[in-house]
């Protein structure tokens, strides 16, 4: 995403506790910088809105999207996006908080760390989703004109590259989807991952 600009402050806040004992209303910074310090991208400043209009405030999280710093009493908007700040103070996006996938072995994966790489390498559209018991990292591949067997072989050969980038040995499983991905009615671009997850678990 780049660096923050004048008038807008950005912090990477903690967004959950391993035991789920977590107060979302408190602004607590993630310690450290870099890929191992992923948290919720949060913003504060005069141009940051204080609430959404009418029913949208409740529909999109309401008070859960706000955190308060008890030291300086500033208010921070939790964007719902996860990311980190590197040593050069650049902000990196890894995906939406609700789209992260927590595998049964304790490893957490984020869409933006995987999908853009596969999409650009093979000219396809992919979606990381929650699968049965999350025993594997399930990647759904949207319908395209490529031969699936050939494409699947290429995807499997890319696993070592992905594992190296993620610095983890991940058991990936690639699943073909015979149609176009379901998308939101507004932007016609945001993948409805929950539907893909249900489809996968019912296969």
Which sequence ranges carry the predicted segments?
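AMP-binding/adenylate-forming catalytic core of the ANL superfamily
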Residues: 45, 50-51, 80-167
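Conserved adenylate-forming
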Residues: 1-37, 146-149, 154
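Short, acidic, Ser/Thr-enriched surface-loop or helix-capping motifs
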Residues: 14-16, 85-86, 185-186
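Short, internal active-site loops enriched in acidic
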Residues: 16-18, 135, 144, 177-183
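Conserved C-terminal "lid"/linker of ANL adenylate-forming enzymes
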Residues: 101, 128, 160-203
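Residue-level signal for well-ordered, solvent-exposed loop/turn and beta-edge residues enriched
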Residues: 11, 18-19, 90-92, 107, ...
């Amino acid at each position: 995403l780049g660096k923050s600009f004048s008038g807008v402050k950005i912090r990477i806040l903690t967004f959950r506790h391993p035991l789920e004992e977590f107060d979302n209303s408190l602004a607590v910074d993630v310690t450290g910088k870099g890929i191992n310090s992923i948290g919720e991208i949060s913003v504060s400043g005069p141009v940051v809105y204080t609430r959404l209009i009418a029913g949208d405030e409740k529909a999109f999280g309401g008070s859960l999207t706000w955190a308060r710093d008890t030291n300086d009493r500033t208010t921070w908007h939790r964007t719902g996006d996860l990311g980190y700040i590197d040593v050069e103070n650049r902000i990196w996006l890894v995906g939406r908080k609700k789209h992260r996938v927590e595998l049964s072995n304790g490893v957490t994966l984020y869409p933006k760390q995987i999908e853009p790489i596969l999409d650009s390498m093979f000219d396809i559209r992919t979606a990381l989703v929650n699968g049965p018991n999350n025993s594997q990292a399930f990647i759904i591949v949207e319908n395209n004109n490529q031969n699936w067997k050939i494409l699947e072989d290429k995807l499997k050969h890319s696993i070592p590259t992905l594992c190296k980038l993620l610095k983890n040995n991940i058991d990936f499983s690639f699943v073909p989807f015979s149609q176009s991905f379901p998308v939101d009615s507004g932007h016609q671009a945001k993948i409805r991952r929950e539907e893909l997850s249900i489809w996968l678990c019912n296969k």
